């Protein structure tokens, strides 16, 4: 059986049971977001949400830090900062974020796939299987990675450049033959500019020493857990940079370049 057929079967089973969207009766299960990806694209790199505050909304997710100081990964209630050296550091609760997405991870769908699969194949398999592309999916993948390519972003100085310029000189790292976890989301197309439409995924190795924003990979022995919700809540900063930013422009091309 192909992996997309296994995903389809897994989603269908939980649809029939009636627990796909509300695991264990959690009617208020939601994805929480601080600020927008559009603001980040415009160089709004300072927010007013602390990681201590963010942790009250979720134990699983991704984002960044004020001054765009690296990539963030939240896994099992622990927050990690991937700095420009590619290494993972613990995040103090006083640190602040200009953009982050979290949820209280409570998956209903699990798929185990032993065979090799790459990033494009994985996206295609999930896209074919999801019962709707108009809701929100939090995705955790624990696997052996034969190869993975990630990036991070270096701390910026004011005046902040747009994110697309930062991404053109981002540090990239390639690793092989290691175990780790993918932490990510699939957002609907209609959310482009609020978030990244489609997939946005970060990586943390099993030893919790390195990671980054995922650009490509080949993995095997994958255990895929998916949390589905129809609820999304966002808070935007009350600081001047966000309030004064021009967020009316169409940023599809810039988002695609910066995130891929």
Swiss-Prot record:
The lineage of its organism: Bacteria, Pseudomonadati, Pseudomonadota, Gammaproteobacteria, Methylococcales. GO terms for molecular function: acetolactate decarboxylase activity. It comes from the Bacteria. Its EC number is 4.1.1.5. InterPro entries: Acetolactate_a_deCO2ase. It catalyses: (2S)-2-acetolactate + H(+) = (R)-acetoin + CO2. Keywords: Acetoin biosynthesis, Decarboxylase, Lyase. Belongs to the alpha-acetolactate decarboxylase family. Pfam families: AAL_decarboxy (PF03306). Pathway: Polyol metabolism; (R,R)-butane-2,3-diol biosynthesis; (R,R)-butane-2,3-diol from pyruvate: step 2/3. CDD domains: acetolactate_decarboxylase. One of its GO terms (biological process) is acetoin biosynthetic process. This is Alpha-acetolactate decarboxylase.
